[in-house]
């Protein structure tokens, strides 16, 4: 609860500020972040495309020109949704419903949905933990592609080799506290803390 979170030099959270933010301020701050859950959390009643466009459609209703230009605005959002889904390899699944998809495909929809709002930071909460090993690769491939495009991401993961390959910085948590922080090379090859060494030895012995 202490410290600050800054995005593009703007303070979006300050633990020392006791002021209660308004709902509008909270919503505005949340737009800096996109969140991809480990359990997908897609809307089962909507198609893949609708899952991706829904949030932006709801936000568009707040635009002063929405009533006047409704069709054009919604068409633009639909086109954007189609492009984002194509970028994660799901252009053939836009009219499907979540239950018709594999777990890996559902997670790629969740990634596309988060990308629709063009967040400054994309946050992943164990994005592969609910997937079979065979499906993990397709999700990691999408995340690796985002890293290649210099997308800023915070990834909670137990995929150690992937974290080592794709990260600029690695943060190792132990019992909710930061145990070690550094470059992938430093943390994985030359850990400073005994706890980090113990964890890595046990992991790579498996």
Task: Pin down the residues of each PLM region.
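Helix N-cap at the start of a conserved alpha-helix in ABC-type nucleotide-binding domains
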Residues: 133-135
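Catalytic Walker B motif of ABC-type/P-loop ATPase nucleotide-binding domains
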Residues: 122-125
């Amino acid at each position: 609860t202490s410290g600050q979170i800054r995005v593009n030099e703007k303070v979006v959270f300050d633990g020392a500020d006791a002021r209660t933010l308004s709902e509008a301020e909270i919503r505005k701050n949340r737009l800096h972040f996109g969140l991809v859950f480990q359990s997908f959390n897609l809307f089962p009643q909507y198609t893949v495309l609708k899952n991706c466009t829904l949030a932006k459609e709801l936000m568009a209703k707040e635009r002063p020109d929405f009533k006047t230009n409704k069709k054009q605005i919604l068409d633009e959002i639909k086109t954007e949704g189609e492009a984002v889904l194509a970028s994660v390899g799901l252009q053939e699944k836009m009219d499907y419903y979540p239950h018709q998809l594999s777990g890996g495909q559902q997670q790629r929809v969740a990634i596309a949905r988060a990308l629709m709002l063009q967040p400054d930071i994309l946050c992943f909460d164990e994005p592969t933990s609910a997937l079979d090993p065979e499906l993990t690769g397709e999700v990691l491939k999408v995340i690796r592609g985002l890293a290649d495009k210099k997308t800023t991401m915070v990834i909670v993961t137990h995929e150690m080799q992937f974290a080592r390959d794709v990260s600029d910085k690695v943060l190792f948590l132990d019992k909710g506290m930061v145990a070690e922080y550094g470059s992938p090379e430093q943390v994985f090859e030359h850990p400073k803390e005994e706890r980090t060494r113990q964890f890595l030895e046990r992991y790579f012995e498996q």
